[in-house]
Amino acid sequence: MLDSAIKDQLKGLFAQLEAHYTFDIFVHPQHESRAELVDLLEEVASCSDKLSCRLQDSEGLKFILLKEGEDTGIIFRAVPGGHEFTSLLMAVLNADGKGKNFPDEFITRRIKALRGPISLTTYLSLTCTNCPDVVQALNMMVLLNGQIRHEAVDGSINEEEVERMKVQAVPTVFADGEQIHVGRSSMGDLLEKLEARYGSVELEAVETKEYDVLVAGAPAGATAAIYSARKGLKVAIIAERIGGQVNETMGIENLISVPQTTGKQLAQDLKKHLAEYHIDILENRRIEKVEVTEGMKVLSVKGGETYKAPVLIIATGANWRKLNVPGEEKYIGHGVAFCPHCDGPFYKDKEVAVIGGGNSGVEAAIDLAGICSKVTVF
């Protein structure tokens, strides 16, 4: 299942593991995906003496990640191949403190302050490019707050459950049986929804931080931050995520000097470039209020942080457009969707409408025409 090149990479990734991890597998003897799951996990485990598998007959199919024999709270009801293979690897590495994309101190405090217990379930597709971000963000929260558990569920091998829960888009997140999120997201956005649902322990006030320039935004904001830092200014960039909506672009072929890249890779490259300068990168934040006080622009961020500077550069990027018509919010994930690649298969052999005649709209219509019985562009 894994070729020798991938195994060599995994051996390098797992070389620094300190704790021992077990893939605790529970699967029915006749489950159609049993062999695929067991083979995958055994091959991954063969890449380090710090990894092992334990197989038990049970109903359904799942495995739990154990650290030194203790349940981490991370559960996969899936064969984590495709885009979710990275989620499997990051679960192990992050549990050992060797991963990446750990939240900063303030976001970590907010996660730890969530009131539990919290039981989360994410329904996903292995072909979905947005699902890993959600799965990995929630798994990170599990590792930081022992009151949280998270199951990542592949809808294709849990079809009856998907129909019962009326899931029509991925990723869809449920919190103790209540749907709280559908579609792409960031750690900051998911954290806000959990805070609203469960509440938090009150945190101590955080001292206001002062800069020369504050930048709020996406790719243009990253450019502004770099130019400002090159002039010797003290700069912070505040955003929900670096790159903004460019993260959703599958292929980019019109960035001069770069023949081909992806949106996610470009966002990673932006972040890497920002890291070359003395720029504070404050991700997973939503700006709630901007005030001008004694010539200073004061930004209040969700969670209680405040920042101030004499100069504020606003470059907010783009988001999925909504119609703002009655019923739209109610039916997101239940008939209203934004991603033809991730959610299109849920509408196979059905009549669909695509709203928008621009480039993205026509591309979506063409993609959907291959699986839907009828596509109408408005």
Predicted regions and their residues:
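Thiol-based oxidoreductase modules, predominantly thioredoxin-like and allied folds used
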Residues: 49-59, 146-160
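N-terminal Rossmann-like dinucleotide/flavin-binding domain of flavoprotein oxidoreductases
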Residues: 32-41, 247-306
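Rossmann-like dinucleotide/flavin-binding elements
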Residues: 206-242, 324, 332, 338-378
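FAD-binding core/adjacent interface of flavoenzyme oxidoreductases
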Residues: 178-189, 199-216, 243, 247, ...
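Local sequence-structure signature of Cys/Sec-based thiol-disulfide redox active-site neighborhoods
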Residues: 3-42, 111-146, 152
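Long, charged amphipathic helices and adjacent flexible linkers at domain junctions
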Residues: 98-113, 201-207, 212-213
